[in-house]
Amino acid sequence: GYDEPLIVTPVNEVSFMSWLGGDVAGTSPYCRNNGWEVKYGYMKAYIAGVKALKEADAGIRIMTTEPLVNIVPRLNATPEEIQHARNHHETQYQSVDMLCGRICPELGGKPEYLDILGFNFYYDNQWILHPHQILGWNDDVPHPYFRSLSNLLQEAHDRYNRPVVLSETSHPGVDRPLWIEYISSQALEVLDKDIPFWGICIYPIIDRPDWDHLHHQWHNSGLWDMDPALGLNSRILHEPSAEALLKCQKLIAAAIEQSGNQTEFDLLGTEALAI
């Protein structure tokens, strides 16, 4: 056994990997226009894995880790364009809906298979569907359709009524500390809404190369950078990010201490999830 509940994510980012491998041939199985079929296959395996895990240890907790996005139409869009963007926005929830058995019930999904909602959120997770345009997170005048992270997390929590984790976030380059401050401000808003908010994961904590350009392009998005001149094992602290993180950790710790719904969560009125 374990001193604490074992938290398992069977497949990371089913939505993104289904698109990458099923629609744009960017990874296995290198398909095009088959995103739904790949997603269905992922979730068939995902749900079978969850069933086996829960049978082996009823105390295991399942945490999904899916991209959290906001997909919107252009300004002055037609009713058809508005509905098209809304449909695309809704697809981000398909994999979790499958896990819960809300859609594709033949896969065996159940509400009790979802314990913790993990979401991966980056600076480019909000965009206009067509013509494609990223909605800036730090613009002097925000786009009218830009939504705060706390608002998006509220939407997801309202949909599933589960504790929330920000399972991936970071920003490349000089805006790293500003992003940490923004994410922290949103965490404070989530806590103020009395949503059970159980953690934030900075990814990468140590800088990493681009997936497609391993030897030539580093993202400079971690708390530590790597200097090629010093070798792959070099660790150079990005001090502005570290200072921002320490400051924000204190603010969040104080807010958590005042919150009454952060260590336990009543799941479906039957049992308490705990961290």
In which residue ranges do the predicted regions lie?
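Active-site region of glycoside hydrolase catalytic domains
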Residues: 1-176, 185, 189-199, 203-275
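Composition- and surface-driven signal marking solvent-exposed, interaction-prone regions
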Residues: 178-180
